[in-house]
Regions:
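N-terminal periplasmic/intermembrane-space "pro-region" immediately following the signal or transit peptide
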Residues: 1-36, 46-54, 74-77
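Outer-membrane pore/translocation modules
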Residues: 77-84, 91, 104, 119-122, ...
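Residues that define the transmembrane beta-barrel architecture of outer-membrane proteins
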Residues: 9, 35-43, 80-85, 134-138, ...
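Extended hydrophobic secondary-structure segments that form protein cores and membrane-embedded regions
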Residues: 13-15, 59-61, 108-114
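Membrane helical hairpin/interfacial module
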Residues: 56-86, 90-93
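Transmembrane beta-strands of outer-membrane beta-barrel pores
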Residues: 19-25, 51-55, 62-68, 114-118, ...
């Protein structure tokens, strides 16, 4: 731990860059049979503020996704430059639901804005780490509890964000995505029961 950063526990910050070369030979996603030698670049930067303004918290995440040296036109699987993939405000109440049997605080979190997250172990809702661009949504999300608790409930009402290659991404105003995922961990240290609804 660095002395200069000791009092910055309220600030989360990170930067990430990935460069990937792909040899796509007879790609099944294309209607032409040829070999493509593509370079995919993805840069992310994240800033989050917590604790210092509690119960208010916020986060902003930027992503720049580009692909070069392809025989095919740009598409939104590989190309989405200068985009905000997350920008949300959060109300965080650490002990709103008391403590669980393990002594952990059971918080209540209410978020609003643009978000990207994963649910049900990425099987039904994932931000697709392999693809060069990211799935995200705009709307509201409420979480009762946290991962260290013996139970947790995550519920949301969102509109999908449509990735636009040439303009700032916007939400699909005609489409809503609702859901809830429960996490029941009381009976076992190695097993979690996850009932869910999505529609």
């Amino acid at each position: 731990e660095y002395e200069a950063f000791r009092n910055l526990d309220w600030l989360d910050a990170g930067i990430d860059h990935r460069t990937r070369y792909e040899l796509r030979n007879d790609d099944i996603r294309r209607n032409q049979v040829l070999t493509d030698h593509q370079f995919l670049l993805r840069t992310r930067a994240y800033i989050g503020i917590r604790n210092i303004l509690d119960p208010f918290r916020m986060a902003v995440e930027f992503q720049d996704s580009r692909g070069y040296n392809s025989h095919f036109p740009k598409d939104n699987r590989d190309w989405n430059p200068f985009e905000l993939i997350q920008t949300y405000g959060e109300l965080y109440f650490k002990d709103a639901l008391g403590k669980d049997d393990l002594g952990n605080s059971r918080p209540l979190r209410i978020r609003g804005g643009r978000m990207s997250w994963e649910a049900v172990d990425r099987r039904l809702l994932g931000n697709n780490q392999w693809r060069n661009t990211t799935n995200n949504f705009e709307g509201f999300r409420v979480t009762f509890g946290q991962e260290s608790n013996d139970w947790e409930l995550d519920a949301w009402g969102m509109q999908p964000v449509i990735r636009n290659i040439n303009e700032f991404d916007g939400r699909s105003k005609d489409q809503w995505f609702y859901g809830a995922v429960g996490h029941w961990r009381k009976w076992s240290d190695v097993m979690t029961i996850q009932p869910y609804f999505m529609g």
